Amino acid sequence: MDEQSVESIAEVFRCFICMEKLRDARLCPHCSKLCCFSCIRRWLTEQRAQCPHCRAPLQLRELVNCRWAEEVTQQLDTLQLCSLTKHEENEKDKCENHHEKLSVFCWTCKKCICHQCALWGGMHGGHTFKPLAEIYEQHVTKVNEEVAKLRRRLMELISLVQEVERNVEAVRNAKDERVREIRNAVEMMIARLDTQLKNKLITLMGQKTSLTQETELLESLLQEVEHQLRSCSKSELISKSSEILMMFQQVHRKPMASFVTTPVPPDFTSELVPSYDSATFVLENFSTLRQRADPVYSPPLQVSGLCWRLKVYPDGNGVVRGYYLSVFLELSAGLPETSKYEYRVEMVHQSCNDPTKNIIREFASDFEVGECWGYNRFFRLDLLANEGYLNPQNDTVILRFQVRSPTFFQKSRDQHWYITQLEAAQTSYIQQINNLKERLTIELSRTQKSRDLSPPDNHLSPQNDDALETRAKKSACSDMLLEGGPTTASVREAKEDEEDEEKIQNEDYHHELSDGDLDLDLVYEDEVNQLDGSSSSASSTATSNTEENDIDEETMSGENDVEYNNMELEEGELMEDAAAAGPAGSSHGYVGSSSRISRRTHLCSAATSSLLDIDPLILIHLLDLKDRSSIENLWGLQPRPPASLLQPTASYSRKDKDQRKQQAMWRVPSDLKMLKRLKTQMAEVRCMKTDVKNTLSEIKSSSAASGDMQTSLFSADQAALAACGTENSGRLQDLGMELLAKSSVANCYIRNSTNKKSNSPKPARSSVAGSLSLRRAVDPGENSRSKGDCQTLSEGSPGSSQSGSRHSSPRALIHGSIGDILPKTEDRQCKALDSDAVVVAVFSGLPAVEKRRKMVTLGANAKGGHLEGLQMTDLENNSETGELQPVLPEGASAAPEEGMSSDSDIECDTENEEQEEHTSVGGFHDSFMVMTQPPDEDTHSSFPDGEQIGPEDLSFNTDENSGR
């Protein structure tokens, strides 16, 4: 075959795009023209999707792979090389000097020579010669080995290129698949996918470009080497083999690992459009709503923490009012940033159930919190009823609104924000719960600690031994102070020591109790409840709802303990003041009195079992003190709170106190009927007390020139003692009337003492206790109103060796002194003794003067008992203090009779009530004068229990001392 024919055939198998030899040939299915795959792909990708020859639409997948074309091109190349080789071989493979065929290879010179040059040329004398064919074969073998390596390298690169192409194709297919799924989604998602695709393609195209460049370099190198092998003669090939090998070595210097590329994953996030969240809004009474012309809001729709609602103008909004129905969608709560949401507003056709007739408007808008988007001209108002959207029977319009995030991504973002808000709120709640638990634990520990460290409740716990020890300690302290009356320095030091000890103890306890969260109002309400008798006893407290009120009950009991300690401190100070104020009196009388005080204190502490057993006289005092608005006196009678709480509490007005009292009364247990009855009776006593005060004022004004009333007064006292013997278990009403009579008796003592002042043969003896008690009797706001009266009644028999009461001590009888300070229970009994006689006289309807005349009298010679003279300071000059200094003979007894039961006997219901004997009135008179009786003789009251003593029940003895 000649050269021309081979060239014509080669033109057929030439690419019509690059006009070069076909590489990876492809066939156009329309015009059947052959072209390189790389050329046609670049054309279709970068230019236009049509064949460059026939202009027919063309895609890469439509090209036909012509595998046979590669074999044809190789054969044509072989034919062309063969023809060229034969022609050049005849001309080039000859010696230049001898024009002979080169047949010898000089090993020394590394040169191909002919046989003449080797034999006769003289240039290669002594050189080593080898046959040219043998050397040629060796070089061809080496070259072929390198060519094989390069081919293997080329195949690897081609496989990598194909893998990258397959990767690119997979990425394109994945992209096309995702695009088909999300074709109807928003443009934002498509742009995001295109951006992801572009980034991945840049990476892949960069990888492919580097691999393609390396492939083209190797192909050109191979073509050059093959051309040299075919075109060069043996000698030329041998001479150029070193250069070819150097080129091969340079290619091998770049390792194959540098061409291994990381595959780009063909994954594109599938962001499918979420479904709508919908709600229905029924506008009832649409005609009425149109007349109002106000917007109507639908119930909120909660979606992923977002709050949507429909805002409807039934009569239109703005310029379209009266013509169109205006409907808007409002985002009332959500993310603070602006976000786009798709919404749909649908008006239901009510004439038929055909959904296709519903009016649907949908759009996507950027919403901010509080912003509305919608349609000002949603539908004409005049066509609502005609078109069937307004139900004429029900006068209703049904609107359905739907909203959604444009993508799941945005919906997930909203949910994440909502979850964050919920977690923050939950964390806050958990923190608050933990804080409350810590506070509860601290309060429980403080309450337990205060219960362990607080002093025992001496007034509420009769079985508490510590109370007896505390009382004994105070009695011993009183003995020491009374015995050392003249030494005021020692008295003051002992008093300060005791006050410091009590103060430290109270401050420690108050610090443990109130170092935190005690509310002043709550403390004051608890105080009001306690003072009004609304606090439950220990037994009733135990049966209450302990699960809810455990802490409150413990706190209340702890406060009661502290306040009773304060009250004990005040009692100790009172006795210390009495002891320090009377150094001029006989000090030996205080020794026996203090012993009796100690014993009385022990029995008194065992007499009170709960707050319900508080002495009724103290409760009656409360009413009197409330009128005076005296908080100090009020808390002096009852346990009072710590000093730190006293100042803000004392600043309250009376109105605030009454309001707080009423607010605190709801805490009163339902089973405290007895306290309610006591309150009612105290109110009655209060009214009667006012009348008695008026009567006393009249008596005081009319008795300025009264005669000697010693015998009459003494008889009245005996009548009071007799009445007291019959009233051991009297009710609160009787006790109230007893209190009413105190001031009257005190005035009688004052008047008689004034008349007998000049007739007293004995020097005046100062009685601090009597003075102090009488001062409290004259002042209605003080605590112990008639203590001086009781003590004056009992003074005057130093020689009496008989025990005046079950609770009096022999030592007190031996030293019988007017300075004996009786315990509270004995004082209350004496108050009861003083009151009955005057109450009987007052309520019998007699005038004030006649009441005084008809009091029970005793003869001056009855059992030798007499009352000599009383000295008293000028009442007019010292009207505020009302101090009385009675002077009694040494024969006066300092203790009451055994027939008179003490107040502790009444409260504790002891056996004294069962052992009472009834005697005559004369016997009662005999029992009053104890100087002539033997020590073992007991006299009792002749009046039975439970009867009211009237004027007719008393004995009136006329004597020379009973005159006016």
Swiss-Prot record:
It is found in: Chromosome; Cytoplasm, Perinuclear region; Peroxisome membrane. Pathway: Protein modification; protein ubiquitination. The lineage of its organism: Eukaryota, Metazoa, Chordata, Craniata, Vertebrata. The modification N-acetylmethionine is found at M1. The gene is TRIM37. Residues 132-234, 419-450, 673-700 form a coiled coil. Its main location: nucleus. Ubiquitous. Highly expressed in testis, while it is weakly expressed in other tissues. Keywords: Acetylation, Chromosome, Coiled coil, Cytoplasm, Dwarfism, Membrane, Metal-binding, Peroxisome, Phosphoprotein, Proto-oncogene, Repressor, Transcription, Transferase, Ubl conjugation, Ubl conjugation pathway, Zinc, Zinc-finger. It catalyses: S-ubiquitinyl-[E2 ubiquitin-conjugating enzyme]-L-cysteine + [acceptor protein]-L-lysine = [E2 ubiquitin-conjugating enzyme]-L-cysteine + N(6)-ubiquitinyl-[acceptor protein]-L-lysine. Changing L76P: In MUL; decreased ubiquitination and abolishes the formation of perinuclear aggregates. One of its GO terms (biological process) is negative regulation of centriole replication. CDD domains: Bbox2_TRIM37_C-VIII, MATH_TRIM37, mRING-HC-C4C4_TRIM37_C-VIII. This is E3 ubiquitin-protein ligase TRIM37. It is a peripheral membrane protein. Residues 752-761, 955-964 have a biased composition (Polar residues). E3 ubiquitin-protein ligase required to prevent centriole reduplication. Probably acts by ubiquitinating positive regulators of centriole reduplication. Mediates monoubiquitination of 'Lys-119' of histone H2A (H2AK119Ub), a specific tag for epigenetic transcriptional repression: associates with some Polycomb group (PcG) multiprotein PRC2-like complex and mediates repression of target genes. It is linked to Mulibrey nanism: An autosomal recessive growth disorder characterized by severe growth failure of prenatal onset, constrictive pericardium and progressive cardiomyopathy, facial dysmorphism, and failure of sexual maturation. Additional clinical features include hepatomegaly, muscle hypotonia, J-shaped sella turcica, yellowish dots in the ocular fundi, hypoplasia of various endocrine glands, insulin resistance with type 2 diabetes, and an increased risk for Wilms' tumor. It comes from Homo sapiens (Human). A zinc finger (B box-type) spans 90-132. The modification Phosphoserine is found at S454. Residues 534-544, 794-807 have a biased composition (Low complexity). One of its GO terms (cellular component) is ESC/E(Z) complex.
